[in-house]
Amino acid sequence: MRIILLGAPGAGKGTQAQFIMEKYGIPQISTGDMLRAAVKAGSELGLKAKEIMDAGKLVTDELVIALVKERITQEDCRDGFLLDGFPRTIPQADAMKEAGIKVDYVLEFDVPDELIVERIVGRRVHAASGRVYHVKFNPPKVEDKDDVTGEELTIRKDDQEATVRKRLIEYHQQTAPLVSYYHKEADAGNTQYFKLDGTRNVAEVSAELATILG
């Protein structure tokens, strides 16, 4: 069961990735984690990646694909894996295909931009404990105060509206073209494509995923 998750930041991919990992026992492969692990391990690919990153450059698609290939041969990926945040672009998707990395399911989480902005911008965090609230969907008992300690809640830099809108623009420019790419792949019988309504509650989306993945 090899799965790619598509969807804008804030579309609920992380929550559902957790559900899939627990239900089906497959690992989530994050390219960021993989790069850090390779650098730490000092592997040949890791040393190459470190050299590029130390120079302040972006790691090449070829190098990331090589890391993905290496990662999916590990024992925990025997029954499959979950890719979130990769591929981000059509050249990356093409490179994956050329490297012989097959994908069984592409799952797109569809949420309108304005709802994503509302979801993210409304988040409030208690920095010390990591407790997360939402002004509309999960408000604290006392406005802007943590329920347990009564301490001030803060807004993460990533959750500020200008940052969220910038990330959405980047997503639509870079990653949205993958939707039509994987539709074509599905039409050619190379994968199965499903679009999920991410505006529903978590349990409803999880239930639909369980039906799709069996």
Swiss-Prot record:
Location of the region described as NMP in the Swiss-Prot/TrEMBL record: 30-59
Family as reported in the entry's similarity comment: Belongs to the adenylate kinase family.
Domain notes: Consists of three domains, a large central CORE domain and two small peripheral domains, NMPbind and LID, which undergo movements during catalysis. The LID domain closes over the site of phosphoryl transfer upon ATP binding. Assembling and dissambling the active center during each catalytic cycle provides an effective means to prevent ATP hydrolysis.
Pfam families: ADK, ADK_lid
SUPFAM superfamilies: P-loop containing nucleoside triphosphate hydrolases
Region (LID) residue spans: 122-159
Binding site for ATP: G10, A11, G12, K13, G14, T15, R123, V132, Y133, R200
Localization per Swiss-Prot or TrEMBL: Cytoplasm
This protein's pathway: Purine metabolism; AMP biosynthesis via salvage pathway; AMP from ADP: step 1/1
GO molecular function: adenylate kinase activity; ATP binding; nucleoside diphosphate kinase activity
One GO term (biological process): nucleoside monophosphate metabolic process
InterPro entries reported for this sequence: Adenyl_kin_sub, Adenylat/UMP-CMP_kin, Adenylat_kinase_CS, Adenylate_kinase_lid-dom, P-loop_NTPase
Claim: Amino-acid biosynthesis is one of the keywords in the record: no
Cited function: Catalyzes the reversible transfer of the terminal phosphate group between ATP and AMP. Plays an important role in cellular energy homeostasis and in adenine nucleotide metabolism.
Ligand binding (AMP): T31, R36, K57, L58, V59, G85, F86, P87, R88, Q92, R156, R167
Protein name: Adenylate kinase
Gene name of this polypeptide: adk
Recorded catalytic activity of this chain's protein: AMP + ATP = 2 ADP
Organism: Yersinia pestis
EC number: 2.7.4.3
Quaternary structure and interacting proteins, as annotated: Monomer.
Gene Ontology cellular component terms for the protein in this record: cytoplasm; cytosol
UniProt KW keywords: ATP-binding, Cytoplasm, Kinase, Nucleotide biosynthesis, Nucleotide-binding, Transferase
